[in-house]
Amino acid sequence: MKLTWLGHAAFRIETAKAVILIDPFLNGNPGAKGIDFKEATKGVTHIALTHGHGDHVGDTVAIAREHGAIVIANADLASWLGSQGVEKLDPGNTGGTVTHDGFTITFVNALHSSAMLTENGVSQALGNPNGLVFHFEDAPTLYHMGDTDIFSDMGLINELHQPEIGIVPIGDRFTMGGAVAALACQRYFNFKTVLPCHYASFPIIDQTADKFLAGMADHRETKVIADPAGTVHSF
C-alpha cells in the first residue's frame, strides 16, 4: 500500500485493487501547494469523506464526475452529493461498514460538526462527523480520525479494530491540538505509525507539527511521519 498526504486532511491510498482519496480538498488548499491535481487524482476509484465541511468535501464532486469514482460518505452527506450530480454513492453511518474490492471502511465516532453553507448563506447540516477505519486485504489497518477532539471511546475503536496506522488531526482550534493528539495516540492506541494532519494549511491553525512531535518524543514504539505534503510512503 502507498500512502500520500495531499495537505490538510487529504490523503491518497493506492492498493493493488483500488485508488482511494480521503477528504480530497486540493483546489484552494493552502497546504496542497506543489501537489499536482492530475497526479493526485490519477486512477481514483473511490473517495471517502469524514464529514461535510468544505475543506474536506473539497473537489469531490468534480473528481467523482471525471473519474466515475464511488463516493463513500455518511448518509446525509451522500444524499447532498447526489443532488450535486454525483452518481456513484455508497452511504453509511456511525458503526456501519461498507465493503469494496480489497478493503472495507467502518464509520466511527468523531467529535466535531458537519455542515455546508447553502447559496443563501445558511448552514445546512450534513449528518454526523466520522472517523474512518480502513481494513485492507494486503495492508495494515488504517484509522483516519477525521476532525475530532480526544474522547475515551477511542479505546473501543482500538479494541475493535486495532489500527496500525493512525492519521491524526493536530492543528488546534477546530480539532485537538498537538499535545492532546499525542495523548490520544499514547493512551488509546498501539499505532506502529502515525501521520499528523490538519495543520500547515490555513493560517488560523498551527503551522508546524512541533507540539505533536514533542508530545510523541518519548513514545518510541510509534513511528511519527511528519514529512511535507506529497511524500509517498509504502506499507
Curated annotation (Swiss-Prot):
InterPro entries: Metallo-B-lactamas (IPR001279), RibonucZ/Hydroxyglut_hydro (IPR036866), UPF0173 (IPR022877), UPF0173_UPF0282_UlaG_hydrolase (IPR050114). Transmembrane segments: none annotated. It holds the Pfam family Lactamase_B_3. GO terms for molecular function: hydrolase activity. Keywords: Hydrolase. Belongs to the UPF0173 family. This is UPF0173 metal-dependent hydrolase Oant_3663. It comes from Brucella anthropi (strain ATCC 49188 / DSM 6882 / CCUG 24695 / JCM 21032 / LMG 3331 / NBRC 15819 / NCTC 12168 / Alc 37).
